[in-house]
Every structure is written in C-alpha cells, then in structure tokens.
C-alpha cells in the first residue's frame, strides 16, 4: 500500500524486493490522487460532491501517472521473469479536509460511494494502458450495485469495508454472495478494458453514486383566516 507522498523509487524498490528476494506475487495499492486534481475535482463536482473539500497538495506530492505507467511496466516484466504475478490494487482512500468538525483532525479519508467514480476511472486508465494484461484487484467503493460487473470484467479479488458499516452489516455479505454465486469463475485471462471503460463512463450519471439533492423543507406559514 503506497502511503501518500511515498516516492516512486521507493515504491519500485520495495516491489522489486518482494518479487526478486521474497518471490512473492505483488500488487501495488495506488492512491486516487494519481488521476490529477482537475479530474478529481471536476468528476466529484458533477456528481453533487462539490461540498467535499481538498486542495492539490496530495496530488502534487503523490505518485504521478506519468511515472507510474513505466514503473508498472517494469515491475510486470520483472514478475514475469521470476514466474510471478504483478498487479495493482485500486484504490486507497482519498484524503479530504475536515470542515465541520467531523473528526478531531485536519484531514479525513473518503471511501465508499463517493470513491467509486474515482477508482473506476483509475481502473479504466490502467486497464486501457496495458490492454487488459495487467491484473487489477478492486477496493474503491465496491458494493452490490457494481461487484458483479467488476468481477465479470476480470477485476478480482474484490474487497470491501464501507458497505458493511451500513444497516445490515455483515448480513450484506449474504446478498453479495448470492449475487456472485451465479457468476462463472475462470482463471485470469485479462481485464475486459472496454467493459471497464463503459463502467467509468456511466459512473457520473449512475444514480447509485450521485449525491441526492435534499429539498429544503417548506417553512412557509399557512395563511391566517
């Protein structure tokens, strides 16, 4: 898991060590900041999350997409030479500013529904870059409404936490298990990058992920007689 601000050379050095010295299949967990500030701000704003506050600091300090792509190509080749698998875990939570005393700190970490439109775009970019040949594990806003599509697109393992913190708790896993029970499991043969592109394209208008507008209550007093 790449902590915010972790230098690219350190990420590559750690992953290379795990592959060549420890002989481990290795996945690097990336941060949503890799999308760039302008894209993240624009996509969240368009979906009703304009109240979520963040600046460009983490976007500037974190791993950049232009550095990540060649590094992941190198690590994938290194893993293949060692008879191992290399892939990405998408994604870490997203740091945002505390503005209403939600927590006794300056930052908190966004997950769940609002994270999905960012993480699925990360999956789209990397899946297209590698034409589906790079393994992707998913964790950014996976839930009942997208887990089947993710799995069928060749993205797995899929992990989740936020959805089981909602009403129903661990009981939601039964619902998810029943949904996936009808999916055929096949050995990894590539990510369907065209299917992932469609998921990302649809995300900004998918009502499951749009922040609903709450109408202000009618405070007008009735006319007196």
Q: Positions of the model-derived regions?
A:
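Active-site-proximal loop/turn and secondary-structure-junction residues that shape catalytic pockets
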Residues: 30-36, 92-96, 140-146, 162-166
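Active-site beta->alpha loop and helix N-cap motifs at the rims of alpha/beta catalytic domains
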Residues: 1-9
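Glycine-rich adenosine-cofactor-binding loop
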Residues: 126, 133-134, 138-143
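Catalytic cores of alpha/beta
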Residues: 12-16, 142-160
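Ferredoxin-type iron-sulfur electron-transfer modules and their immediate structural context
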Residues: 185-225
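Structural preference for beta-strand elements that scaffold enzyme active sites
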Residues: 25-29, 83-89, 96, 133-137, ...
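Secondary-structure boundary elements
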Residues: 8, 12, 16-27, 77-82
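Glycine/Thr-rich beta-alpha phosphate-binding loop at enzyme active sites
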Residues: 36-132, 167-185
């Amino acid at each position: 898991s790449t902590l915010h601000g972790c230098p690219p050379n350190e990420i590559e050095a750690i992953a290379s060590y795990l592959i060549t010295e420890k002989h481990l299949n290795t996945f690097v967990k990336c941060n949503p900041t890799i999308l760039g500030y302008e894209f993240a701000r624009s996509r969240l704003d368009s979906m009703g999350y304009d109240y979520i506050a963040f600046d460009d600091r983490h976007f500037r300090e974190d791993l950049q997409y232009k550095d990540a792509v060649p590094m992941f190509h190198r690590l994938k080749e290194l893993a293949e030479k060692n008879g191992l698998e290399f892939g990405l875990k998408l994604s870490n939570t997203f740091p945002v500013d505390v503005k209403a005393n939600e927590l006794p700190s300056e930052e908190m970490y966004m997950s769940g529904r609002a994270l999905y439109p960012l993480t699925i775009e990360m999956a789209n970019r990397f899946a297209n870059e590698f034409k589906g040949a790079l393994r992707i594990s998913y964790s950014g806003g996976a839930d009942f409404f997208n887990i089947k599509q993710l799995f069928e697109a060749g993205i797995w393992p899929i992990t989740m936490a936020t959805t089981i913190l909602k009403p129903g708790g661990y009981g939601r896993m039964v619902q998810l298990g029943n949904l996936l029970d009808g999916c055929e499991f096949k050995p990894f043969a590539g990510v369907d990058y065209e299917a992932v592109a469609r998921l990302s394209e649809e995300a900004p208008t998918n009502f499951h992920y749009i922040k609903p507008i709450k109408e202000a209550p009618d405070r007008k007093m009735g006319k007196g007689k």
